[in-house]
Amino acid sequence: MRCPYCQYEDTQVKDSRPVEEGAVIRRRRVCPVCGGRFTTFERVQLRELLVSKKSGRCEPFDRDKLMRSVEIAVRKRNIDPDYIERAISGIVRGLESLGEPEIASEKIGHLVMEALKSIDDIAYIRFASVYRDFRNASDFHDVIDELSKGIANTESCFDE
């Protein structure tokens, strides 16, 4: 693997261990040229997924982009990062197991909403405000009412 510091092509693995219940391999690497140390993670990717956007264009699925959007929703909440990582892995496995090469962005948003609903109400509301395109305070009030009644409707923008 290429060194992220000096771009040397052949770094050495110093330590490997399974994480996330064996679903991921964490590797500590060192560059023999500059001495830079860094960590890589190796995951199984069952298939290449494409995301069809609302605009009609398609782009490759980006796990890191999904992680960033969830991290924004859970920012400043006391949630274990490993728990979020497991939730993201579950969402990705769910997408891969659908067997569809192209997945609507709405479907991904729906799966994230379902995951966040079980993790943290505030994160759920934050994500919903973007996913459902909230326009005013009453939109927040509606989703809070749904949560308090235990009937959060994550399908308002998604038709299965």
Curated annotation (Swiss-Prot):
Provide any one GO MF term from the record: DNA binding
Zinc fingers (unnamed) at which residues? 3-34
Q: Which residues form the ATP-cone domain?
A: 49-139
Set out the biological process GO terms recorded for this chain's protein: negative regulation of DNA-templated transcription
Asked whether the UniProt record includes Nucleotide-binding among its keywords, one would answer yes
Q: Which cofactor does it need?
A: Zn(2+)
The reply on keyword S-adenosyl-L-methionine is no
Question: How is the cofactor bound here?
Answer: Binds 1 zinc ion.
> Mind telling me which Pfam families this protein's record contains?
ATP-cone, Zn_ribbon_NrdR
Q: Which UniProt keywords apply?
A: ATP-binding, DNA-binding, Metal-binding, Nucleotide-binding, Repressor, Transcription, Transcription regulation, Zinc, Zinc-finger
Q: List the disulfide bonds.
A: none
Q: What does this protein do?
A: Negatively regulates transcription of bacterial ribonucleotide reductase nrd genes and operons by binding to NrdR-boxes.
According to its UniProt record, which protein family does this protein belong to? Belongs to the NrdR family.
* Protein name per UniProt: Transcriptional repressor NrdR
**Gene name in the database record:** nrdR
